[in-house]
């Protein structure tokens, strides 16, 4: 999701430049930003698909390869050089803001390559194999409306095995360098990979688009696509996911580490400091942010103590937490639909107040969905942006492993407001 967020920033920057001509903004700088945005979509076609741009839906870059990393480094260096030809002090206030956002975003992406994050090519959250499952199910971001859409997915899928081979090679490089994932994460990744390796192609998640073939497709196209999707599942999907699952279980897991944070890795302190900078967009040190966090925890804990006293609970705060977790009154749901309906109720109560709080509100449709079973066990609630033209809704995904254990005191409203 991080990359999607970056694309939103760059898209906004580009749009602002396009709309700012009459106020004296630099048209040459705006062109550089526009070129950057378009070239970035070509470089990262998965991001383009998420962003609703379907021109590159047939492409899947091998983004962990040495060649791609060199290409990406040259891309960021080239555009930084172009932008730095403009003197910031000579720009309008609006262009200075765009200049600062751009140089920060491009430099952060360039600096990322110093730390060899490609040695940990995916985990249980951020994983192309999971994204491929979402795309290939036929109900995600990848469109399946035309014959060309179906062919685009086959072309994109054809590059997946090569990507997976590179991922395994990078995991092995990480083992040699001591840059490996924690065991606690790897054990969650293994069943994810295994869930995709289904022997019967018609039972595969990736057969979903075939079960939803549009009625206006010709019979010849329907037969061809059914045959080609079946072959792709048998020859690409099943063996690739099996290979990833077997590798993680038999080779990588024994080499994975018992520690948890990045700081436990070689050069881990620098990796962590970089990640903090990238995530917070500040120059605060990890220690400064940690101390800020401690202050916030103390403040919130004080408010929790006040609530405990207001409701006349007899006991300390840990006992109060256990009470809220165990009391059946706080677990009223019996089915996943009831959980989703509760979130929809929050949505309906929130909706009339949006225009009071925000100048601009999204025009695209909005949906609340249960997180797909293949990733629910390791997922958190999350929001996938819709497209500006409204052709794809924004989707709030909620993992519901057991509706009867879903607790209303877990912060449903705050979770919904933050994510959705």
Model-derived features: positions:
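N-terminal maturation segment of proteins
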Residues: 17-420
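Sec-dependent N-terminal signal peptides
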Residues: 4-13
């Amino acid at each position: 999701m991080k990359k999607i967020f970056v694309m939103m920033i760059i898209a906004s920057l580009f749009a602002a430049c396009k709309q700012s001509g009459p106020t004296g903004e630099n048209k040459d700088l705006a062109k550089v930003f526009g070129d950057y945005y378009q070239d970035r979509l070509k470089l990262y076609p998965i991001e383009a698909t998420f962003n609703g741009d379907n021109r590159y839906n047939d492409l899947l870059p091998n983004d962990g390869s040495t060649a791609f990393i060199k290409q990406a480094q040259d891309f960021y260096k080239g555009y930084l050089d172009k932008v730095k030809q403009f003197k910031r002090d000579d720009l309008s206030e609006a262009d200075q803001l765009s200049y600062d956002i751009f140089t920060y975003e491009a430099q952060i992406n360039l600096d990322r390559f110093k730390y060899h994050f490609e040695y940990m090519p995916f985990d249980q959250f951020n994983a192309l194999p999971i994204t491929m499952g979402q795309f290939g199910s036929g109900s995600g971001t990848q469109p399946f409306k035309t014959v060309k859409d179906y062919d685009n997915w086959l072309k994109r899928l054809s590059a997946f095995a090569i990507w997976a081979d590179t991922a395994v090679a990078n995991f092995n490089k990480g083992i040699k360098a001591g840059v490996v994932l924690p065991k606690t994460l790897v054990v969650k990744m293994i069943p994810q990979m295994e869930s995709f390796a289904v022997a019967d192609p018609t039972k595969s998640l990736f057969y979903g688009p075939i079960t939803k073939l549009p009625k206006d497709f010709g019979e010849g196209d329907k037969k061809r696509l059914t045959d080609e999707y079946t072959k792709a599942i048998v020859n690409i999907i099943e063996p690739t996911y099996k290979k990833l699952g077997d590798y993680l279980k038999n080779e990588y897991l024994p080499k994975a580490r018992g520690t948890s944070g990045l700081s436990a890795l070689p050069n881990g302190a620098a990796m962590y400091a970089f990640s903090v900078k990238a995530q917070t967009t500040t120059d605060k040190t990890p220690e400064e942010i940690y101390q800020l966090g401690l202050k916030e925890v103390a403040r919130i804990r004080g408010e929790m103590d006040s609530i405990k006293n207001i409701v006349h609970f007899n006991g300390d705060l840990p006992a109060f937490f256990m009470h809220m977790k165990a009391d059946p009154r706080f677990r009223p749901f019996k089915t996943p639909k009831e959980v989703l309906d509760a979130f929809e109720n929050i949505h309906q109560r929130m909706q009339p107040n949006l225009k009071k709080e925000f100048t601009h509100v999204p025009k695209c449709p909005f949906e609340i969905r249960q997180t797909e079973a293949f990733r629910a066990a390791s997922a958190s609630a999350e929001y996938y942006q819709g497209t500006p033209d409204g052709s794809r809704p924004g989707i709030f995904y909620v993992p519901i492993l057991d509706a009867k254990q879903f607790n209303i005191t877990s912060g449903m409203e705050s979770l919904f407001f933050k994510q959705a």
